[in-house]
Amino acid sequence: MIRCNALIRFWDEYLQSPSVPDASLNGLQVQGPQEVNKVVFGVSASLALFEKARQAGADLICVHHGLLWGQPERLTGLLGERVRFLMNHQLGLAAYHLPLDKHPHTGHNACLMRALHGQNVRPFGTYHGVDIGFAGEIEPAALAEVVSTLEAFCHTSARVLAFGPKTIRTVGVVSGGAYSMLPQAISEHLDAYITGSLDEPAQEWCREGNINGISLGHYHSEKCGVEALARLTAEKCGIATEFIDIENPL
């Protein structure tokens, strides 16, 4: 068991959350029990996740995509129903968005870079003045081999825009819906850019920029950091944790 405020303080300090500007209201978003015995982790807040967390006996839910995004909102509609469920079932909710994207050990992008055995890894992917991804070198490998490694790691099927070098030596990684950072990868002459979702402009950017684009899906590109945080929390805080997968093809 751990006090809820002590657990939030641990996450805040480990992820350096207060120092990261973000639209997400990172930290505790909905108050639950003061004492936490079990935390359920998931990628995104939803009623489906909340119900599974209740069934799993959780006291607190921790997600990457929370409910509150820095703007005054009425507790009506979908938001109202989600908050009502949490309150009725005495479930707390915490969220960590950009702090989990950018963390050099536990973040999604660090995990993806490790899956490729990245070397000389450096911050990359500037978003509102904050580098939230990583770029680095990998052992030279065919594009198909890189894609296969990522698909196995993320348990997904990738979408590939093969317009760059056939042998990959340098990569940039920014998980989630980060197709707009593709021009940054082009300007740094990287061989491949890895993200969650690539939107319509990405095809011609890749063609004209001589770069390979690899899309893993927004959801699947951001499971690994949440899973890593769950493992770390169990190890450091001595409480039960469980990652719940609400499958999402997008």
What are these regions (language model features)?
Residues 1-250:
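Active-site catalytic microenvironments in core metabolic enzymes, especially phosphate/sugar-handling
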